[in-house]
A protein has these predicted regions:
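Nucleic-acid modification enzymes, centered on SAM-dependent nucleic-acid methyltransferases
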Residues: 1-39, 53-299, 315-346, 360, ...
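Conserved beta-strand signature within the Rossmann-like core of class I S-adenosyl-L-methionine
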Residues: 336-340, 372-378
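A short glycine-rich, Lys/Arg-flanked "PGG" loop and its adjoining helix->strand segment in the class I
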Residues: 354-370, 395
Length: 446
């Protein structure tokens, strides 16, 4: 199978390791008919659920990560484009009026006030101020002036309720620990932290429902860009974004104007909403629950098909840790101790990972109808991790039927910079054989 580029409906938010929508959709169409029930026990951002619902299937997703569940459910239930655009404009106008003075510089062309778009830094030293002038429409950049430095140093009050807490130093936070970063607010410049918190407060004033949820997720989708984690790349490195799967503070970095980049993100969210609505959303055929898939709340033999992309183990992506900043700003808490992962910094060893996979796939076997199919996508170069996956599926009672490579549309930055990183996923198709009995249900502690 060959992956295609992502359709606009997934532009709402970044999520690590997301599988290509066309591969998921093709698999669902191949193994089910409309009206069938499709399960994803590691549903993540909800691609299986969205593609299944779009194709007229009932969907059931489960994930321990509350951020993932909120993203999946929001994607299934978008607001109307007009309502979202109107509320977004109100939020942006309100916060821009309160923070414009924090992002002002002088235009080199006409000497009038211009809007700071970004500021380049080398360590703590301000190197370059980039701007766009609303008066003469010029875009430019200059070395920082005394005025630029004075504005950047302003200590305006932090809004009440601004999200913050001590950082849990798991695997993906070690670069921060070595830099002496201790609290999440330390990732931001002062003015960016204040502005991001004002955006959040303005969004929370929106009446509850899909508009507010999509605005909140548009903000969390922007959060990394509002921190000091955005490298000041040059050349063909692409736009400013969170490019590597860890928290870090690059030596050369950019301070981006939060309102400017939130407005850009809103445009992407609006594109996603329009694509989803054109595909038939909001969908009412199911959703994602925050639950442990080692104890699925589903009846025996009640599912027609399973499609899932389990956590990779070994040195794979730490989904829970990489969602912690997003969860903080959504006022969500995760139970990281139950995560199916390998993480020596949180004392989750390979046995914990293998046991977790085994418990989930036993439950998949229990709820899948005899003679039906399960598709698993997986990528890892560690034979021990592959052995854990295959043992989990086979010990649960599944029979491997076929495998095929899934070629990606483009390599990630991690794949480009790390020769040992897997270059393609494998697609594995299993069957629950037609036989009497089902795998016994197991609790999360088994």
């Amino acid at each position: 199978m060959s992956a295609e580029t992502w359709p606009p409906r997934y532009k709402l938010h970044k999520y690590w390791g997301r599988k290509p929508a066309n591969v998921v959709a093709r698999s669902i169409e191949m193994f089910t008919e409309p009206g069938a029930t499709v399960l994803d026990p590691f549903s993540g951002s909800g691609v299986t659920l969205v593609e299944g619902a779009r194709l007229g299937r009932r969907v059931a997703g489960f994930d321990l990560n509350p951020f993932a569940a909120r993203l999946a459910n929001a994607t299934l239930s978008p607001p109307s484009p007009a309502d979202f655009e109107a509320e977004a404009r109100r939020v942006i106008a309100e916060v821009r009026s309160r923070t414009a003075h924090l992002y002002t510089t002088s235009c080199d062309a006409c000497s009038k006030d211009a809007v700071v778009r970004s500021v380049g830094y080398a360590g703590d030293a301000m190197i370059e101020v980039r701007y766009r002038c609303p008066a003469c429409k010029a875009s430019g950049a200059h070395a920082p002036t005394s005025r630029d430095r004075e504005i950047a140093a302003l200590r305006v009050p932090v809004p009440e309720g601004a999200p913050d807490e001590d950082i849990l130093f798991g695997w993906e936070m070690q670069k921060l620990k070595r830099k002496g970063v201790r609290r999440w607010s330390d990732l931001f410049t002062h003015r960016n932290y204040v502005t991001a918190a004002l955006l959040r407060r303005a969004i929370l004033d929106v009446a509850g429902g899909p508009c507010r949820e999509w605005l909140l997720l548009s903000l969390t989708a922007s959060l990394a860009q509002l921190t000091r984690m955005i490298a000041d790349f040059s050349g063909d490195a692409g736009g400013p974004s969170w490019k590597i799967n860890c928290y870090w503070l690059p030596k050369s970095w950019q301070e981006l104007n939060p309102v400017w980049y939130f407005e850009n993100r809103v445009g992407k969210s609006l594109s996603a909403i329009r694509d989803l609505v054109a595909a038939g959303a909001p969908f009412a055929q199911g959703g994602c629950a925050v639950a442990d898939s080692r104890a699925l709340p589903l009846a025996d033999a009640s599912v027609d098909y399973v499609f899932t992309d389990p956590p990779y183990g070994g040195e794979g992506i730490q989904y829970g840790e990489l969602s912690m900043l997003w969860c903080l700003w959504l006022a969500e808490r995760q139970d990281l101790s139950a995560e199916v992962a390998y993480n020596p910094f949180r004392k989750l060893d390979h046995a914990h990972y293998a046991s977790g996979l085994g418990g989930v796939f036993r439950e998949c076997h229990r709820v899948l109808k005899p003679g039906k199919w399960m598709t698993v996508t997986f990528a890892n170069k560690d034979p021990l991790v592959w052995s854990a996956l295959m043992a989990a599926c086979e010990d649960a009672g599944f029979a491997l039927v076929t495998t095929a490579p899934m070629r990606r549309s483009a390599p990630s930055l991690t794949e480009t910079n790390m020769p040992a990183a897997p270059k393609e996923d494998m697609v594995l198709v299993f069957e629950r054989p037609r036989r009497s009995g089902v795998a016994p249900a197991r609790g999360p502690s088994d």
